[in-house]
Structures are given as structure tokens and as C-alpha cells.
UniProtKB/Swiss-Prot annotation:
GO terms for molecular function: RNA binding. GO terms for biological process: RNA metabolic process. Residues 82-179 form the AD domain. Residues 1-68 form the Sm domain. Present with 8320 molecules/cell in log phase SD medium. It is found in: Cytoplasm; Nucleus. This is Protein LSM12. PROSITE patterns: AD, SM. The modification N-acetylserine is found at S2.
């Protein structure tokens, strides 16, 4: 005997999907237009409510467990959605986009892994560090060109030698660290 899914609303069901994952709960809804089941997986009077939406094409086995509820108030039960602060969501989204753009600016395009590592090490110490093509520019005064060795550090403006010794030390230590890491990677 075949039973319409709409007639089983409110029943406890056990669904096994094609990956043999079993979900138990109350059948909350069946949508024939997009061929999905919504199963309420939380216990009665538990808040917040948890639901699983399962595409019927992924169902391997569906079993109604338990007897027919004597009083099926489930069809009339309405779960009120939680309040969502839209302004807060928009603010978090904007902050996330800004952080993502900032992170993207810190990634060199077409540079070697060593070059990116050197950039990251300099940026940790000196925040005013940026990529210009494949060159690392620090404080708009110092440039480090590929292959990003100490001898590739150039002063852009005469008289701005104050920060060059610090940058040379950072680059030197970074290369030492890279060489140590390469030694550990050996197979």
C-alpha cells in the first residue's frame, strides 16, 4: 500500500540516504515542486528548532516509525522564525568584504613563494608595506626586487637610510628561516 507523503506530516520517520546516513525526526513538510522533505530533528519544546532538508532523489529508504499520532496538531503548529538583525548582518558582510580585499592586497601576483614569505615577514614588522608589480615597497622609501635577497634591496630616495638596516636584517633572517625549513623538508 502506497501512502502520500502529505498524509504522513507529523509522523516520526527514519530516512536513510544513498550514503547510508540515517536521519530521524518528524516529517515537517513535503514540497512536490522541488521534490524535498523537511524533517524536524529537534525534540518537542526544544529551542532553537533544527531542520534537515533532504532531496527525495537522495533517499534510499524511508520508514514511518511509531503509530499514527492520535491528535495531529503538527499540521497546525507554526514555528516562528528567529529575529535576524539585518543591519548587523550587512555590517558583518561589509567588514568581511573589506578584510578580504585587504588580504588580497597583501598577496603578490605572480611572485614566488619565497617572495611572498619575505613580504609577510616585512609586513609583520612594518605595516606600511605593499606590492607594486613584483617589487616589495616599504614606507615608500625602500624597494626589494626579485629574487628578494639582501643585495636586491634598493633605496628609493636619498637620505632615507634609516630603515634599510632593519629591512636588511628582516630579509636576512627570513632567508635563514627558509633555508632551515628546506633542510627539514628533505626526504
Amino acid at each position: 500500500m502506497s501512502v502520500s507523503l502529505e498524509q504522513t506530516l507529523g509522523f516520526r520517520i527514519k530516512v536513510t540516504n544513498v550514503l547510508d546516513v540515517v536521519t530521524e525526526g518528524r516529517l515537517y513538510s513535503f514540497n512536490s515542486s522541488n521534490n524535498t522533505l523537511t524533517i524536524q530533528t529537534t525534540k518537542k519544546n526544544q529551542s532553537p528548532q533544527n531542520f534537515k532538508v533532504i532531496k527525495c532523489t537522495f533517499i534510499k529508504h524511508l520508514e514511518v516509525i511509531g503509530d499514527k499520532p492520535s491528535f495531529n496538531s503538527f499540521k497546525k503548529q507554526q514555528i516562528k522564525p528567529s529575529y535576524v538583525n539585518v543591519e548587523r548582518v550587512e555590517k558583518l558582510l561589509k567588514e568581511s568584504v573589506i578584510a578580504s580585499k585587504k588580504k588580497e592586497l597583501l598577496r603578490g601576483k605572480g611572485v614566488s613563494a619565497e617572495g611572498q614569505f619575505i613580504f609577510d615577514q616585512i609586513f609583520k614588522t612594518i605595516g606600511d608595506t605593499k606590492w607594486v608589480a613584483k617589487d616589495i615597497i616599504i614606507l615608500d622609501d625602500v624597494k626589494v626586487q626579485p629574487p628578494y635577497k639582501v643585495e636586491d634591496i634598493k633605496v628609493l630616495h636619498e637620505g632615507s637610510n634609516q630603515s634599510i638596516t632593519l629591512i636588511q636584517r628582516i630579509v636576512e633572517r627570513s632567508w635563514e628561516q627558509l633555508e632551515q625549513d628546506d633542510g627539514r623538508k628533505g626526504g
